[in-house]
Amino acid sequence: MLDVFSRKIVGWAMETHLETTLVEQALRMALAQRQPGLGELLHHSDRGGQYASKTYQQLLAAFGIIVSMSRSADPYDNALMESCIGTLKTECADHRFPSRQVARSELFAYLEGWYNRRRLHSALGYLSPEQFEHQFLEDKLSLHSKG
């Protein structure tokens, strides 16, 4: 799950399947991390079966999440996530891993240690997602203290 505002990966999961439980795990991680209020989120995805499933749609509804789905066969509708996945494949998953455990460990290190904390994004003024969020909050606090 990608926070479009800061480009931060806020939820992810890794399994040997693409079933609904996979995206449920990622969503629950994102919700635990962000703790949004009801009706404050928009969830955009492609039309994959795991996202369109009744179970997943009910979970989104239970948290008051607004649902948006790409048009069929149009990757440009989900360009930010497609770009993020392309970056992940190029920078982290460009080789075979000796085991799933090693793959999971390397994915965790990449997402949590590199991508969110240190990888610079031109769209964020060459800040990492965490630096961008920190700067945004500092600027917001500064405005409130002046007002």
Regions found by a protein language model. Name each.
Residues 1-147:
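Charged DNA-binding/catalytic regions of mobile-element recombinases
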